[in-house]
Amino acid sequence: MNRLLASALLVGSAVVAPVSAACIKNATVTEVDVAIIGGGASGVYAAARLIDNNKTVVVLERNADRIGGQTETYYDPTTGTPVNVGVKVFSNTTVTTDFLKRFDFPMGTLNVGQTLATGTQYVDFATGKLIPNFTAVVPAVQAAAMQRYAAELAKYPQIKFGYNLGPQVPEDLVLPFGKFMEKHNLTGMAQTMFEFNSGYTPLLEIPALYILKYLDTYELQSLQSGSFIVAANGDSATLYRNAAKFLGERVVYGVSGMHIQRSSAAGGRVTISVGNSTTGTHMIRAKKLIVAAPPTLDNLRSTGLDLDTTEAGLFGKLSAGVFYSLVVKDTGVAKANLRNRHPANPYGFPDQPFIYSVIPLPKTSGLAQVLLGSASPLTASQVEARVAADIGRLPASLRGNATSVPKVVTMAAHTWNVMAPVADIKAGFYDKLEGLQGLKDTWYIGAAWATQSSTTIWEGLEQEFLPKLLAAL
């Protein structure tokens, strides 16, 4: 992409005013094969593979200085140690390792099961009391439960990369996951499911469909083998820094306003106008549009997408929880990983919103990572208050006699688990949603269509989505 386009589209944090027809008519125009909204795992992978197939692309990214979506890293200003506050692990598949190698990602391995079992103490954060003799996992029982889970998962190949549920949605898929576990004797893996499915809250009430999609074949195999890929240098964002160098000026950063017009006519074009009072307006005309952003109605409207009533009606059914990954100072927690349980509840799962865990971070200036889940968005002040209160009531023995108030130094809020109501799922919601693919030259990809797993997103793009898109170009 030429420097003129890059400079014309660098809008920083300015708010873009509505674009008039006259502005669009007089704007500079750049033609591309595909415009991509969102530079996360799906958008970046799609862009790279389209370039491999000799297609021209532009990636429109809201962040002012990075791509990578939910892959975020905090760097301790005192020690420089990286702390991943987003994506930490990848499943080991050929598509995954090829993509990581392509961008010189330093690969290491992590045994998640071993990590959960090592140096952990269980605490009721609602009371601050230790829970003695809490047994999270019985290895043989869990292994047998995982085998039964794998057998259930194998019944639904139609949800591997999408939601091809058909007219008769299997009843098991809309069962609350707690009932699904009981029905299929999976309770022996409940504790690991709770930790591994962080962000899916309340876990026992979420339709089994979404849990089966998240803990899919790739993730389950990695969990069973104990082998996930991690960044050997501790910094998952390495992948996207290197990918950004490859994409170069094909990425437009800091996009805070757009106006998108699509045509229903065959062979039409998608017109995207971007600009502000400083740079003026620039227009991109694309053969196809990829939306690689969470498809909640508010989020799509914020992109300037010209949704019709059918599209708005469908996307308006979707809602999402939020998973907060925090770096906190002055916790005093230094010797053990603290995991939250409430003994009075089924399986000890705490009431949401709640802290999942407090993990001390080695090689930092006394920092800890705190994970918090909520079925609905919280304000920053609500998150900070929850962290201060819950950690503040821990006994002195766990806080090293610290008396200072814990303070959040960075907060990554991730849109998590975009879901539809059960009644709509039963009524064929996902068949209708899948029917939007390709209409008005618009295609949708990302976690809401695959799952919150980079590996599954990339596998789905490679095996199913990209062949269809390339055939349509």
From Swiss-Prot:
Which residues are modified by glycosylation? N26, N54, N92, N133, N185, N276, N401
Keywords, in A-Z order: FAD, Flavoprotein, Glycoprotein, Oxidoreductase, Signal
Has UniProt tagged this entry with the keyword Transmembrane helix?
Answer: no
InterPro entries xrefs: FAD/NAD-bd_sf (IPR036188)
Q: Which cofactor does it need?
A: FAD
E.C. number: 1.1.1.-
* A GO BP annotation: terpenoid biosynthetic process
Q: Where is the signal peptide?
A: 1-21
Named in its record, the pathway it takes part in is: Secondary metabolite biosynthesis; terpenoid biosynthesis
> Domain of life here?
Eukaryota
Q: What does this protein do?
A: FAD-dependent oxidoreductase; part of the gene cluster that mediates the biosynthesis of the diterpenoid pyrones subglutinols A and B. The first step of the pathway is the synthesis of the alpha-pyrone moiety by the polyketide synthase dpasA via condensation of one acetyl-CoA starter unit with 3 malonyl-CoA units and 2 methylations. The alpha-pyrone is then combined with geranylgeranyl pyrophosphate (GGPP) formed by the GGPP synthase dpasD through the action of the prenyltransferase dpasC to yield a linear alpha-pyrone diterpenoid.
Similarity field? Belongs to the beta-cyclopiazonate dehydrogenase family.
Query: Would you tell me the protein name for this molecule?
Result: FAD-dependent oxidoreductase dpasF
